[in-house]
């Protein structure tokens, strides 16, 4: 919710004890300048007027200029004007003003490098006036410049330290404070460390080092504005009062302000007020009194309000600026915001797992339905994994086809072998008993060409001669090609079954079996998938069929199931067209399932699994293969019966009536 409103303004603090009266009228002008700084308004014009007015006013203006410099570049230009006025001045107070102006120039240098060059010129003028001012300006330039310039300025600061130890310590403290105000990175911390080392070379380095450490801690406290104000206050106090105790007191006050970081703005105002008070005290030459007041402030620094009251007390009696009240208590939490809008829809889910293959018996019906459907149905079937897709599976397949761009999901384990279909109707009667096999083969080829699916299946099942089987395999291949062209799904399914039977009969010739299996696979693929995919599928199917033939001894039902499953898997893989290796793995898994269903040796299944692993199948594929082996535990169905013997032919029609015989010879008389 929205944060609560600001609490009511606290009551104004008690009036501080009246401070010592300032000696000169310039002090009165300084008081006015301090009031302007507290008001934080008319900064540039007031700063210029103060610079023209007096050195103490210039010191106060330095604090105001620091905040103003953070505010805008125009204030930096005003600071440069103040620096010029300081150069025009030529008294000890003017030297102090030059030091304050140097701090302002440091802010200006932070604003622009050209201003840094001007600050160097001002430093030269100040050097003509006083070496201490030059050291302060050099330290300011070091704070403003980069690390290398800081090192050079550090050397200059060392020379300044040789000139005046106390002034050098003050300059080092100012430099550390300025660096903290600049809020540079670790380089600034290193510069501060170098300044601390230079201060260590100085006599009264201990207090200065403590002040520098306090300034660094304040900077680390992330109160950048407060740190800048504290830095200006420290510089003004150090330049005005040569006593290290006063600097230490100022540092303690700054530390207290940093501790009370809750109200950064209030702390900055208090620091500015303290700086104005220190400047007024310096102008009044009552350094001891200022130190005592600062010590009292440090002692009473427990509460920020107390510190503000102390600062007010330190200020001239004429100013009597009321301190801002303590911040109000935290407002109650606002009511909860309205509920957010519904998020955007999630991304499409992964494609679902493939459905298990339906029973083989249903396959014929499904194929017929596919044939009844147009080529679109064939395309859907191509997407489907199983040759015998259920209606729901077909719908899922359509969805998958839409999302074909995604990687193909792993093929699900093949379903258990279906029961064999019912025996076909009896085949046509053979012409002659002797040549029955050959005649049957020829008839089968003719029937297949004629697309008499039932008769072809019966004849193929009836065929049993090995030599005839080879011929039949060739004929079946031709028939399969014709059927594929005709796109008769039922005939294709029958041809696949016939080819499986022929392969079982012709197990003796491995090559013939492989050819037959390949032809069957091609036919099944053509029936199940689009004709275009069949060409690509043929090679993979042939390899898969060869692997299957090698893996398991051919059993009629097992071979048929293996051929159908392999063809379906190969077709799906071809449709995916992503990884031929995956297709090979799927074919291997199908072969393993077929072997298990046929109750073949377990070793063969293990070998098939090993082959799949060797084929770089994914781990998921391997798991699927294991699951398929587990699921394939169902008993294999027995092969279908051969068709009944054909009915005897109808009796022939009765012959025509014979011609009348010749008249008999004449009888004897």
Swiss-Prot record:
It is found in: Secreted, Extracellular space, Extracellular matrix. The modification 4-hydroxyproline is found at residues 3, 12, 336, 345, 414, 420, 426, 648. Keywords: Collagen, Extinct organism protein, Extracellular matrix, Hydroxylation, Repeat, Secreted. GO terms for cellular component: collagen trimer; extracellular region. Residues 318-360, 405-438, 638-669 are annotated as: Disordered. The modification 3-hydroxyproline is found at residues 413, 650. Type II collagen is specific for cartilaginous tissues. It is essential for the normal embryonic development of the skeleton, for linear growth and for the ability of cartilage to resist compressive forces. These protein fragments were extracted from 160,000 to 600,000 year old bones. The tryptic peptides required multiple purification steps in order to eliminate contaminants and to increase the concentration of peptidic material. This is Collagen alpha-1(II) chain. It comes from Mammut americanum. The lineage of its organism: Eukaryota, Metazoa, Chordata, Craniata, Vertebrata.
């Amino acid at each position: 919710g929205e944060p609560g409103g600001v609490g009511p303004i606290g009551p104004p603090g008690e009036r501080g004890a009246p401070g010592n009266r300032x000696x000169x009228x310039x002090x009165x002008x300084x008081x006015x300048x301090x009031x302007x700084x507290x008001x934080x308004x008319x900064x540039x014009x007031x700063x210029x007027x103060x610079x023209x007015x007096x050195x103490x006013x210039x010191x106060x203006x330095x604090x105001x200029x620091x905040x103003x410099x953070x505010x805008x570049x125009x204030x930096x230009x005003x600071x440069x004007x103040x620096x010029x006025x300081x150069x025009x001045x030529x008294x000890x107070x003017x030297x102090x003003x030059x030091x304050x102006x140097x701090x302002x120039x440091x802010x200006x240098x932070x604003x622009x490098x050209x201003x840094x060059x001007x600050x160097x010129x001002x430093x030269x003028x100040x050097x003509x006036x006083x070496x201490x001012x030059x050291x302060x300006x050099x330290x300011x330039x070091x704070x403003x410049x980069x690390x290398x310039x800081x090192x050079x300025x550090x050397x200059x600061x060392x020379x300044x330290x040789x000139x005046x130890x106390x002034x050098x310590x003050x300059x080092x403290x100012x430099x550390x404070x300025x660096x903290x105000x600049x809020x540079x990175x670790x380089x600034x911390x290193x510069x501060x460390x170098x300044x601390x080392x230079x201060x260590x070379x100085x006599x009264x380095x201990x207090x200065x080092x403590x002040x520098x450490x306090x300034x660094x801690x304040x900077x680390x406290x992330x109160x950048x504005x407060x740190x800048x104000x504290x830095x200006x206050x420290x510089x003004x106090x150090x330049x005005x009062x040569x006593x290290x105790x006063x600097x230490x007191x100022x540092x303690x006050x700054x530390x207290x302000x940093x501790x009370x970081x809750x109200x950064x703005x209030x702390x900055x105002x208090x620091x500015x007020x303290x700086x104005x008070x220190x400047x007024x005290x310096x102008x009044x030459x009552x350094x001891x009194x200022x130190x005592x007041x600062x010590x009292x402030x440090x002692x009473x620094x427990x509460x920020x309000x107390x510190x503000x009251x102390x600062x007010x007390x330190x200020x001239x009696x004429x100013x009597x600026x009321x301190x801002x009240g303590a911040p109000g208590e935290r407002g109650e939490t606002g009511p909860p915001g309205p509920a957010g809008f519904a998020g955007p829809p999630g991304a499409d889910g992964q494609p679902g797992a493939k459905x298990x293959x339906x029973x083989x018996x249903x396959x014929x019906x499904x194929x017929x339905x596919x044939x009844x459907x147009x080529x679109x149905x064939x395309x859907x079937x191509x997407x489907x994994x199983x040759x015998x897709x259920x209606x729901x599976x077909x719908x899922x397949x359509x969805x998958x086809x839409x999302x074909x761009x995604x990687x193909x999901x792993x093929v699900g384990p093949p379903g258990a072998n279906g029961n064999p279909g019912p025996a076909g109707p009896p085949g046509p009667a053979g012409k002659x008993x002797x040549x029955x096999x050959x005649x049957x083969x020829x008839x089968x080829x003719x029937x297949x060409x004629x697309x008499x699916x039932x008769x072809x299946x019966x004849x193929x099942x009836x065929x049993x001669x090995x030599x005839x089987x080879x011929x039949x395999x060739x004929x079946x291949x031709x028939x399969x090609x014709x059927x594929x062209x005709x796109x008769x799904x039922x005939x294709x399914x029958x041809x696949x079954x016939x080819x499986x039977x022929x392969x079982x009969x012709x197990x003796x010739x491995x090559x013939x079996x492989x050819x037959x299996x390949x032809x069957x696979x091609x036919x099944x693929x053509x029936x199940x998938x689009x004709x275009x995919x069949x060409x690509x599928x043929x090679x993979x199917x042939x390899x898969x069929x060869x692997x299957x033939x090698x893996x398991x001894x051919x059993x009629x039902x097992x071979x048929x199931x293996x051929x159908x499953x392999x063809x379906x898997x190969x077709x799906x893989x071809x449709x995916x067209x992503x990884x031929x290796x995956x297709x090979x793995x799927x074919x291997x898994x199908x072969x393993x399932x077929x072997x298990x269903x046929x109750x073949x040796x377990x070793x063969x299944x293990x070998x098939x699994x090993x082959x799949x692993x060797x084929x770089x199948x994914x781990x998921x594929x391997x798991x699927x293969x294991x699951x398929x082996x587990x699921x394939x535990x169902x008993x294999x169905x027995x092969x279908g019966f051969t068709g009944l013997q054909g009915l005897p032919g109808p009796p022939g029609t009765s012959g025509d009536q014979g011609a009348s015989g010749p008249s008999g010879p004449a009888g004897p008389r």
